[in-house]
UniProtKB/Swiss-Prot annotation:
InterPro entries assigned: MeTrfase_TrmA_AS, SAM-dependent_MTases_sf, TrmA_MeTrfase, U5_MeTrfase_fam
Coiled coil: none
Top-level EC class as recorded in UniProt: transferase
Active-site residue list: 327 (nucleophile), 361 (proton acceptor)
Source species of the chain: Sulfurimonas denitrificans (strain ATCC 33889 / DSM 1251)
Protein known as: tRNA/tmRNA (uracil-C(5))-methyltransferase
Encoding gene, per UniProt annotation: trmA
GO terms, molecular function: rRNA binding; tRNA (uracil(54)-C5)-methyltransferase activity, S-adenosyl methionine-dependent; tRNA binding
Cleaved signal peptide residues: none
Matching PROSITE patterns: SAM_MT_RNA_M5U (PS51687), TRMA_1 (PS01230)
Length: 369
């Protein structure tokens, strides 16, 4: 990736030597990090070299009343750097960025605009969120509708306590995994995987690691069903939990979008779910689910950066197989200290979700000793 802001913009930290060098550094670092638990080959899944980010956030910097610019934090933490392009972002976002600023300025809706967020799909759909330090009135809505038509985008106007939606607040992403197509509605301001090509590879790896057996699957931290829905063809039934109400609603919508019928999504934290599973407490949210009908031998987890707590690790250890996707190698390392008391790590993978940074996503498969 060629970027004229390398070394100045804080979005990319590791840029000397190009893509292969930064990836090699990540691989070697994580081989050493996980050596106490796994000495086998770590499968490595590369990112596209540029235009890989399907969502991005930029500050807006005003130069008097004449001009507005995109801005990012400087790598040296000395304020911001003004930018006119970012080769990280998807081709659709890249092409839109200058057109959007010109339209905002031409239609005079830049007053107290402080940020712009982009969300795109592989097909080129884009939701643009315009963030303001002022109330948004009917005039804003009228102008935003004009810009939406001009640029063929969806627009969200956001201010404190306000969300003005022009047309719709989501894009429909199509993922291709091992020759199968999956559709997902990605909603603005909710978590989605930022690197679509690496996401497809993560799902594919996890599918191949899931054991083939006539049984059911339990998933914790299921989000909007990014993994759950592709997994559905491999199991009789899937029970998937997530604490976020909006994510559960999105997961149910995505299940319908893909015509999948063998998943039960439940809005519950892990602690509550364990109490329900063990019959300690009865929850109305579980009243339509016959827990005793599930034969679960495999658990899939994709926790937040904080990883799993000790109680969740103990719970996961009940099951014969554990597939763990981690967005923080340090917390995965901590959790493996507990999980390997009962399980062996038999396979690992590294996914380069965020090129030119120190960040890596990891996958681990564990089986009971």
């Amino acid at each position: 990736m060629n970027c004229k802001y390398f070394g100045i913009c804080g979005a990319c930290i590791v840029y000397d030597g190009g893509y292969e060098t930064q990836l090699s550094q990540k691989v070697e670092l994580n081989k050493e990090l996980f050596a106490p638990f796994y000495m086998g080959k770590i499968s490595v899944f590369e990112s596209p070299r540029s235009n890989y980010r399907s969502r991005s956030e930029f500050k807006i910097w005003h130069e008097g009343d004449e001009k507005i610019n995109y801005a990012m934090n400087r790598a040296d933490k000395g304020g911001v750097i003004l930018i006119d392009e970012c080769p990280q972002v998807s081709s659709a976002i890249f092409a839109l960025m200058p057109k959007l600023l010109r339209a905002i300025k031409r239609h005079k809706i830049d007053f107290k605009l402080f940020g712009v967020d982009f969300l795109s799909s592989n097909s080129g759909e884009i939701v643009v969120s315009l963030l303001y330090h002022r109330a948004l009135d009917s005039t804003f809505k009228e102008i935003a509708e004009i810009i939406s038509d001009e640029l063929d985008i969806y627009i969200i106007g956001r201010s404190r306590g306000q969300k003005v939606v022009i047309k719709q607040d989501y894009v429909t992403e199509i993922l291709h995994v091992d020759g199968v197509e999956f559709k997902f509605n990605y909603i603005e301001n909710s978590f989605t995987q930022p690197n679509a090509k690496v996401n497809e590879q993560m799902i594919g790896w996890a599918l191949r690691e899931l054991p083939n057996m006539d049984a059911d699957l339990l998933e914790l931290y299921c989000g909007a069903g990014n993994f759950t829905i592709p997994f559905a063809s491999k199991y009789r039934k899937i029970l998937a939990t997530e604490i976020s109400k909006s994510s559960i609603n999105a997961a149910k919508s995505n299940m319908s979008l893909n015509k999948v019928k063998n998943i039960s999504f439940v809005r519950m934290g892990v602690e509550e779910f364990v109490e329900a599973l063990d019959g300690v407490r009865i929850f109305n949210r579980m009243k339509e689910i016959d827990i005793d009908s599930y034969e679960i031998k495999t658990i899939f987890v994709d926790p937040p950066r904080s990883g799993m707590d000790e109680a969740t690790c103990r719970f996961a250890s009940r099951y014969e197989n554990i597939i763990y996707i981690s967005c923080n190698p340090q917390t995965l390392l901590r959790d493996l200290e507990l999980l390997t008391k009962t399980h062996n790590v038999i396979d690992m993978a590294l996914f380069d979700q965020f090129p030119y940074t120190h960040h890596a996503e990891m996958g681990a498969k564990l089986v009971k000793k």
